[in-house]
Amino acid sequence: MTTKPENPYSALERIFHEPNRLAIMSALCGSANGLTFNELKEECGLTDGNLSRHLKALDEAKVIKIKKAFVSSKPQTTVFLSDTGRENFLEYLVALEGVLKKAALAMALEKKPASLPSILGKIARV
């Protein structure tokens, strides 16, 4: 009996696959202390409303934590990756890397088998 190989696309979680959410999660990965709403808005190039909508979806999925506080008598929202979010996003990135390598390999073989080492070298550097 042969087993069917796992679909590599099944691990691409929809919550992360939207480009703005991918940007938000990527920005948060580099900040152990979280990012303020305004820092995230600037880094990701989003409007207040657009960022709020995506943060709500990520919060409902429990992949981020949102802390609201007053700093110098002004409200401040800070966003952090949750432990689950960090783990799930890393799994997503590994799955995405596998899908991209598979696509690059298919394109290299279709174009010119001799270019395969060059393309795989570029993928490895990313």
Task: Describe the predicted segments one by one.
Residues 62:
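Glycine-centered, phosphate/nucleic-acid-interacting loop/turn motifs that mediate DNA/RNA or nucleotide
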Residues 66:
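Short beta-strand "wing" residues that participate in macromolecule-binding interfaces
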Residues 2-7, 26, 87-126:
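Amphipathic alpha-helical dimerization/coiled-coil segments
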Residues 55-56:
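Short, hydrophobic-biased segments on the C-terminal half of alpha helices
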Residues 71-92, 96:
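Basic, amphipathic "hinge/linker" alpha-helix immediately C-terminal to the N-terminal HTH DNA-binding motif
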Residues 7-50, 69-71, 76-80:
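N-terminal helix-turn-helix DNA-binding core of bacterial DNA-binding proteins
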Residues 43, 52, 114-116:
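Short amphipathic alpha-helical "recognition" segments used for binding
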